[in-house]
């Protein structure tokens, strides 16, 4: 419907005044002068990138990754850092838990010499460091490990046993309001790792909750629930974990999809195993008995040998990765079924007052 001439002039004057006062680009029509595609960074897992719908985690947004202990939360974020650094991006790790292992990070492909790291004393200090790094415009990815370890200054200076009801939730709420706009302007990805707690007295539904109040749940564009669902063994020796990640919330694509992959101890996500599995599923790799073939050429007998072939031939692995991404992210293939609506409800109506 056309706007009459007087209204158009009034609107143009208002837009001009806004841009003069707040800067060019402070207001615009949704379809003009901006890319509708969201820039993303790979998670290090092909199946998770596809489940996210956009090929990775979105830049300029807040992401929350939560799960039980030893489920792979820190490993996943270190893989994100490694992927970002390979693209020449600058990354920072806010180690509130004081538990980052640089040797393990290096094994996962992280360039520890160029990784900014901080071990803050208080939650307020950690969040102020995040804000300062964001406002610099020079940092592309920031990891906070973890929300549960962001202890308010008043709690640290008080005595054990003192009641500090709602302090952490209030601190996180203030930080989210301040950080959200700065992250968008700087195009910085901020990932919060979070822990799980149990709500007392829940008779029906999921008793699990995450720490830090409700603000993070609202401000996060993506929320990932990561779980260890089994062990990978070589004989009697456990060498890794079977891992499932559910996309509980997604503002950039359809939510409630899930991905399964292997995390190998000392190596990280088994990307070559994912390439083999997805390649066979989508008929890019042929399987005859125990033999796997790609482009008519045998690449290995058994999955382990085929993974070794891809590891020794990164060009072949990169070609297969590109074909799978083009096929599955364009919608010509399907990765995994969405969880049911009932699962989605169970999978985190989370609140927290710790």
Swiss-Prot record:
Annotated SMART domains: AAA
The UniProt record lists the keyword Nucleotide-binding: yes
Key words, A-Z: ATP-binding, Cytoplasm, DNA damage, DNA recombination, DNA repair, DNA-binding, Nucleotide-binding, SOS response
Localization annotation: Cytoplasm
Keyword S-adenosyl-L-methionine among record annotations: no
Record-listed ATP binding positions: 67-74
InterPro entries: AAA+_ATPase (IPR003593), DNA_recomb/repair_RecA (IPR013765), DNA_recomb/repair_RecA_CS (IPR020584), P-loop_NTPase (IPR027417), RecA-like_C (IPR049261), RecA-like_N (IPR049428), RecA_ATP-bd (IPR020588), RecA_C_sf (IPR023400)
Molecular functions per Gene Ontology: ATP binding; ATP hydrolysis activity; ATP-dependent DNA damage sensor activity; damaged DNA binding; single-stranded DNA binding
Lineage top rank: taxon: Bacteria
GO cellular component: cytosol
Name of a matching Pfam family: RecA
A GO biological process held by the record: SOS response
NCBIfam families on file: tigrfam_recA
Family membership noted in the UniProt record: Belongs to the RecA family.
Function, in words: Can catalyze the hydrolysis of ATP in the presence of single-stranded DNA, the ATP-dependent uptake of single-stranded DNA by duplex DNA, and the ATP-dependent hybridization of homologous single-stranded DNAs. It interacts with LexA causing its activation and leading to its autocatalytic cleavage.
Identification of the protein by name: Protein RecA
